[in-house]
Amino acid sequence: MDNLKSLTQKENIILSDIALEKFEIYRKLILEWNEKINLTAITDEEAMNTKHFLDCLLLTKTGLFDDDKTVLDVGTGAGFPAIPLKLYNENLKITMLDSLNKRIKFLNIVIEDLNLKNIKAIHGRAEEVGRKKVFRESFDIVSSRAVASLSLLLEFTIPFLKVNGLFLAMKGPSYLEEVENSKNALKKLNCKLENVLNFKIEQNGEISERNILIIKKVGKTPNNFPRNMGQIKKKPL
């Protein structure tokens, strides 16, 4: 994993030798399970290090992941960004949410094989789990790398946050347009865009843009959110 070590050092992200070893185990598990269930189209080691692992670890540049905060990762898939964040700082208390049970099975094996504590994977849809008292308004940070519009992600994620908690959305170059289209959602869900961190990642001469939107919850979520998927599709915020 020398490639990952050099990539992270360039961004001043420090990983322990143990963390680097666990990233290698994690990578092999992804490749093994990718033959059974669809986890990622990126299977080349160098590309995985750049487009998955480093990309997720850029979240640590916010300075928000250096203690024992409670973190929820919505639509976690193969565990991105939850597992890389946990390997960066094992003190984080992380919950991973995904709607596909096969991925939950995979994530539980990752947790076991990497010997991770204070991290769990739960099966469910965000718009349903977000209405449950045990999860609602109970996290310091919610992250999502899911491919969905910002307004949709806001309705899926903001209900999970404590007041003054932060939602971190990972977006590509068209984020300004998404923010503009999400003004109504931001207002109705009692949150505001606090900051945007911009990064450029290079791999084999190809440069990709990554933007981390930091959105703060400034008031309690109204009881009617999140709505069911039928309502969300019929009338998006």
Positions of the model-derived regions?
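Class I SAM-dependent transferase core
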Residues: D2-D68, L72, K105, I109-I119, ...
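Helix-to-beta-strand junctions that scaffold the AdoMet/dcAdoMet cofactor pocket
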Residues: N89, L161-V163
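Short loop/edge segments at beta-strand edges and connector loops
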Residues: T43, H123-R125, N195-L197
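Conserved beta-strand signature within the Rossmann-like core of class I S-adenosyl-L-methionine
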Residues: N164-S174
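Short "lid" loop at the C-terminus of a central beta-strand within the Rossmann-like core
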Residues: E127, G172-L176, I201
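Conserved SAM/SAH cofactor-binding pocket of Class I
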Residues: L57-A148, L154
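SAM/dcSAM-binding transferase cores
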Residues: E180-L237
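Short alpha-helix immediately C-terminal to the canonical SAM-binding loop
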Residues: R103-K105, Y175, V179
